[in-house]
Amino acid sequence: MDKKIMVVDDDPDILITIRKIFEKEGYELFTVDSGMDCIYELERGFKGVILMDIMMPFMDGWDTINEIMKRGLSKDVVISILTAKGTPDHEKLRGLQSNVYDYITKPFDIKSLVKNVGHMAAM
């Protein structure tokens, strides 16, 4: 898999922080602030790692992941949830388990995040 990451988060500070971290690691970064923009980029051919926030307006991360699956856009991506919501919604996570690589809570440990993304990018 290419060293590409799409960060889907409505918090501009998170988008900037993650961009700085992963550009130093040699990744190509795409940042979008909504689920619909994520789907748009996937339809345009994005392939790589997706770090998906859950709590976003209009279309939350769960709905975005469901829409990605429904449209058949998950073939060339690995999705990881990156959220401030400390405890996962186990019922929703169970339904998406085969399509979600990891559940990472904010604030995140930078070294662990870089390591996890490295594993996902190697898939």
Region locations from a protein language model:
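Receiver (REC) domain active-site loop signature in two-component systems and cognate sites
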Residues: 56
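Charged docking surfaces used in two-component/phosphorelay signaling
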Residues: 16-24
